[in-house]
Design a protein with these regions (language model features):
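Long, histidine/aromatic-enriched segments associated with O2/redox biology
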Residues: 1-172
């Protein structure tokens, strides 16, 4: 049965770190092997710092997906759109990989990020890193207040999963 990454369905944390990467040419196979190690590193950190409630998520950009897993491209996969609204503007900065790290301890996020950077080197370029936090009125890591239509529990997990004929870790 398919399982969501821990960061997909985790509850809000106090601290977070977003890492945006671009992959250097010719590093696809090397990076593919390294991506399989992220969950083991997360498990190790979760055991060592259990009180931190660490979670992690790795997202592969729509433009990079065919390089890393060409045999299975989800039908729903698309690039993040530009969002222009009178109150908000979110412009797109395409990247190959996005790593979201969240926990209740900023030091654990920092240490975990160092492990990710060490793991991915020299295959990637860190384009940007953004520290984030839980705001006073309980906003989520993106700065939005959860509305009544936000999925919770099993519905949240069902919404998060894509139909996949196999596990990513089983793919080459």
């Amino acid at each position: 049965m398919a399982q969501a990454q821990s960061g997909i369905c985790a509850e809000a944390n106090l601290h977070g770190l977003h890492l945006f990467f671009n992959v250097f040419d010719g590093q696809d196979e090397s990076l593919r092997a390294k991506l399989k190690q992220v969950s083991a590193i997360e498990e190790e950190f979760s055991d060592q710092f259990s009180e931190s409630m660490l979670s992690c998520m790795v997202a592969i950009g729509a433009q990079y997906w065919p390089h890393i897993l060409p045999e299975y491209i989800p039908s729903e996969l698309q690039s993040f759109p530009n969002i222009n609204h009178s109150d908000h503007q979110m412009s797109v900065q395409p990247c190959d990989l996005f790593v979201q790290i969240r926990s209740d301890r900023e030091d654990v996020n920092h240490l975990f990020a160092l492990q990710i950077l060490k793991l991915f080197a020299p295959d990637v370029e860190l384009v940007e890193q953004i520290r984030n936090f839980r705001f006073l009125d309980g906003r989520d890591f993106n700065g939005f207040i959860y509305g009544g239509d936000t999925a919770h529990g099993r519905k949240k997990r069902a919404t998060a999963l894509i139909s996949n004929p196999g596990n990513f870790e089983d793919q080459g």
